[in-house]
């Protein structure tokens, strides 16, 4: 049930399908999307379906000189029309599209036509009941029609009463504000570029630029589209108040079918070094002064007129650093000294695709004059190994020439993050009680709460306690738990750690208690399932047990008595889990 599915509202049916519904965790039980129709629309539609298929009309005909009454099966003809509308816009589309599992969202909007067809049968169901009562009840046709209309009106009323609250987006401005927060995380000067990936990361930013006029000096670059020539053409043109992105390639070098991908062949590195050693002048003329300089690799290899050279001949690229440009760029100095070269590791990569090459081209050409960012929600598989050079500034990671994943290097600009969160961010009116937060919006709320918790922890590590407390209080006010429940995924334990380090253990205890309650409720629910469904929920059980273990660790920093109580509860639940054949990873081998 936590992943969707349907329920009837009748406990004897639902319990047999999905386990004891009374043991559902509170955040599922109280979710506004937890709707029950008691099968009323289904039953009404089936009544209409069968009535239409079997409907006949009486008529009198003369046979063998006698007047007789016969039935004409006219309903079946109409039935096939509606049925094929239902089939072709529903099941036929399912078969034709043959969608892969693990779709990013429910695709029910693709089958809207089949819902229209079934709605016709629901309407005919009303006629079917009227027709039946006219034959059985001793009432006038008008009275029967009125009574049936009133009774069957309960079906759409029930549907509306159940689904209205989880379709009500009024007073919720999260999409606009969260998109704006990404733009507000960017440097205010320098026409920054931000790489995004996917619809939910990109469209809110485009909306803010197009409609609200926010962040029009920035360029939003969607990595999913950057694989195509038409989108690269767009990036090479100015937009709003943003100049074109620094891509110098002529169109023939990135048009469709050209440089779709380029293999990474580190084995060629030694041969090139030997060539430079034996014949340096010829080598420099052919491949540039520095063979593995990013600009030279893109120019002399990837864009070579010789197709045999369309490779990346190394797994380590370099960008020579203009140190004065870095100092003027506005970025945080991640270490005491600016490196002579930026190192871009391609370790583990077998090929770079067109979008990757365009990212590298922008880095090679920008010379740190234009800040380049990657949205926090972009997966690491989409930006090569550039994460080694990130400095986080709010909801974005800034690409810098520094290697920031080594000891002693800074990878979080707390001053900019604090400024952005406290003065520039908006939170979509999440403070208003009663808002419906759907699954996708909830994920973005989680991202924001985790960001605030992470910022507070970073500030505390820098002994900036007052600013950290400001951030923690901001999270409590702007992302309240009555709209965005506190659990592990929403950053509940990080918030607790922040309050502990800030010296306010009572606030930390509130977060710990809520994380524990949610995790224990989920585990208890999984343990109540039948053997088959319990086996399917093994990974979910393991995840909740690990969350509870982490919660115990944080609880021990707050109150030993509470931590001991949690440990006892966890041991009891784990005993039940183990008794049903459950095992933790690597256990029992």
Locate the predicted segments by residue.
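ER/secretory pathway lumenal C-terminal domains and tails of membrane proteins involved
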Residues: 1-111, 117-191, 203-589
């Amino acid at each position: 049930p936590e992943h969707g599915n349907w329920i009837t509202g009748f406990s004897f049916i639902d319990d047999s399908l999905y386990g004891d519904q009374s043991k559902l965790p509170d955040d599922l039980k109280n979710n506004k999307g937890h709707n029950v129709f008691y099968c009323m629309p289904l039953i009404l539609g089936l009544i209409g379906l069968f009535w239409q298929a079997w409907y006949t009309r009486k008529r009198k005909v003369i046979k063998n000189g006698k007047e007789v009454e016969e039935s004409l099966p006219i309903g079946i003809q109409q039935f096939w029309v509606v049925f094929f509308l239902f089939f072709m816009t529903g099941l036929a589309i399912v078969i034709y599209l043959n969608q892969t599992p693990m779709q990013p969202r429910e695709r029910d909007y693709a089958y809207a036509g089949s819902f229209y067809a079934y709605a016709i049968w629901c309407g005919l169901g009303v006629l079917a009941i009227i027709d039946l009562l006219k034959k059985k009840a001793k009432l006038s046709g008008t009275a029967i029609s009125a009574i049936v209309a009133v009774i069957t009106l309960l079906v759409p009323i029930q549907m509306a009463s159940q689904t209205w609250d989880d379709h009500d987006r009024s007073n919720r401005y999260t999409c606009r504000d969260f998109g704006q927060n990404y733009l507000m995380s960017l440097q205010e000067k320098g026409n920054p570029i931000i790489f995004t990936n996917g619809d939910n990361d990109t469209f809110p930013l485009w909306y803010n630029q197009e409609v609200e006029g926010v962040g029009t000096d920035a360029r939003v670059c969607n990595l999913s589209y950057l694989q195509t020539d038409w989108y690269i053409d767009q990036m090479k043109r100015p937009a709003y108040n943003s100049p074109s992105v620094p891509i110098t390639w002529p169109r023939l070098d990135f048009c469709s079918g050209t440089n779709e991908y380029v293999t990474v062949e580190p084995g060629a590195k030694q041969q090139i070094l030997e060539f430079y050693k034996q014949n340096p002048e010829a080598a420099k003329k052919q491949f540039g002064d520095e063979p593995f300089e990013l600009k030279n690799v893109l120019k002399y290899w990837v864009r070579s007129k010789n197709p045999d050279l369309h490779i990346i001949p190394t797994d380590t690229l370099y960008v020579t650093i203009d140190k004065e440009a870095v100092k003027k760029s506005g970025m945080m100095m991640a270490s005491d000294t600016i490196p002579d070269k930026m190192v871009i590791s391609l370790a583990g990569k077998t090929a770079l695709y067109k979008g990757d090459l365009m990212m590298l081209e922008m880095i090679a050409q920008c010379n740190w004059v234009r800040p380049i960012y990657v949205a926090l929600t972009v997966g690491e598989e989409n930006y090569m190994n550039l994460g080694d050079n990130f400095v986080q500034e709010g909801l974005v990671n800034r690409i810098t020439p520094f290697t920031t994943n080594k000891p002693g290097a800074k990878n979080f600009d707390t001053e900019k993050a604090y400024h952005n969160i406290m003065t520039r961010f908006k939170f979509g009116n999440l403070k208003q009680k009663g808002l419906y937060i759907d699954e996708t919006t909830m994920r973005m709320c989680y991202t924001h709460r985790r960001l605030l918790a992470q910022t507070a922890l970073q500030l505390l590590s820098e002994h900036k306690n007052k600013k950290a407390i400001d951030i923690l209080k901001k999270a409590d006010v702007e992302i309240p738990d009555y709209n965005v429940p506190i659990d592990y995924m929403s950053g509940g334990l990080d918030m607790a750690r922040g309050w502990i380090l800030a010296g306010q253990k009572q606030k930390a205890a509130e977060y710990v208690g809520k994380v524990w309650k949610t995790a224990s409720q989920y585990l208890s629910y999984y343990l109540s399932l039948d053997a088959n469904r319990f086996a399917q929920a093994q990974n979910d059980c393991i995840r909740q047990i690990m969350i509870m273990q982490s919660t115990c660790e944080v609880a021990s920093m707050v109150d030993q008595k509470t931590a001991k109580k949690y440990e006892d509860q966890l041991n009891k639940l784990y005993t039940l889990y183990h008794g049903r054949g459950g095992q933790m990873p690597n256990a029992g081998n």
